[in-house]
Amino acid sequence: MTPSEFRQSVRSGAFRQPTAGQCGPFAQANLAILPNAYAHDFLRFCQANPKACPLLGVGEPGAFRLDVLGEDLDIRTDVPSYNVYRDGRLTERVESLEALWRDDFVVFAIGCSFSFEDMLAREGIALRHIEEGRNVPMYRTSIPNRRAGIFGGQLVVSMRPLRGADAIRAVQITSRFPGVHGAPVHIGHPRELGIADLGAPDFGDAVTVRDGELPVFWACGVTPQTALMEAKLPLAIAHTPGYMLMTDITNASLAVF
């Protein structure tokens, strides 16, 4: 299935699941959508936190199509699930933004670690959340983001349990792709990140961590949602964690070496 065909399946309501493992050679994107009045500070926030918020594209006010991300792409309809925040609180999840869309909305598309999972799988590195048919586990850490204006919050990380040799190979592979979070930020000791229980993720689903495996943590594009919550904007929108926008950008084109 091509990315365009996948987006059409989302738009028609046929696909409403987490997007890990879909259209493997193509990059997926996190979304943050907010009024133009706050867009400059949010852009500065992303630039100050490039590990968690690597920008793939930024739209013009009111634009719900970003040609840099793909043809026949509609931000309002092509994500399986959206989070709607009002005054910093998650008030609802919706499957379309057509009724909520405003002429002053600015779209920020942020790289997603689902993008490099295809490369890991090609190297024979098994990914537990895909094996178990679950959403990837994501955790809010105790590490503060670099603040920009009203935007701060804490770093969010995704976790994949790997054996030592696979963890080393994963570092080597993902280091080539800073546009989709790059190398892990931590391996092995969740408490050093302020994570008390791997079995209780803040977002996504818990997965099995087997004996002899290390939890490997990558910076996560859900990080901006902690900033949106802390800023308490009257209205802001994001993807539901794990339910991403499929782009036409090839993962290979994002490699830096």
Curated annotation (Swiss-Prot):
Keyword Lyase attributed: yes
SUPFAM superfamilies: PSTPO5379-like (SSF160920)
Gene Ontology molecular-function annotations: lyase activity
Source organism superkingdom: Bacteria
InterPro entries named in the record: D-Glu_cyclase (IPR009906), Putative_hydro-lyase (IPR038021), UPF0317 (IPR016938)
Keywords, ordered alphabetically: Lyase
Protein's name according to its UniProt entry: Putative hydro-lyase BamMC406_3459
